[in-house]
């Protein structure tokens, strides 16, 4: 994920995401198989949505995105199909426990912690 300010876009090939990435987590390989080879991006409210969490697949080596796209261009990815949670104000941190549950810290007036569990 390469994010730069809008005034620098002409100098860089960027992934123009519709949100502001704020936290990243890659589960350890010993964690739940549901999240194996995934990267999670927590984000703050953007121009098109409130805050939330995206799950993007990684390749077997866990070093590149494994995103199916007609032209394999990250600039044209439909991010909505990777969203697994939304309606947060701003995801400021995420952690994943041994059971594969994702704990999300939402930066609201007094703060809140939510748990996201894999669908069975």
Model-identified regions with their sequence ranges:
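Beta-rich catalytic cores
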Residues: 20, 87-90, 109
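Hydrophobic residues at beta-strand termini and immediately following loops
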Residues: 84
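Residue position within the beta-strands of beta-propeller blades
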Residues: 41, 103-106
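C-terminal alpha-helix/helix-terminus motif
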Residues: 106, 117-120
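Beta-propeller domain segments
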Residues: 1-81, 99, 111, 118-119
């Amino acid at each position: 994920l390469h994010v730069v300010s809008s005034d620098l876009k002409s100098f860089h090939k960027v992934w123009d995401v519709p949100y502001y990435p704020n936290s990243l987590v890659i589960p350890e390989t010993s964690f739940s198989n549901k999240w194996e080879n995934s990267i999670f991006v927590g984000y703050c409210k953007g121009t098109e949505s409130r805050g939330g969490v995206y799950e993007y697949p990684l390749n077997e080596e866990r070093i590149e995105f494994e995103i199916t796209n007609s032209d394999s261009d990250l600039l044209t990815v439909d991010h909505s199909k990777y969203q697994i949670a939304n309606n947060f104000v701003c995801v400021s941190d995420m952690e994943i426990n041994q059971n594969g549950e994702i704990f999300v810290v939402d930066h609201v007036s007094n703060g809140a912690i939510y748990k996201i569990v894999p669908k069975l």
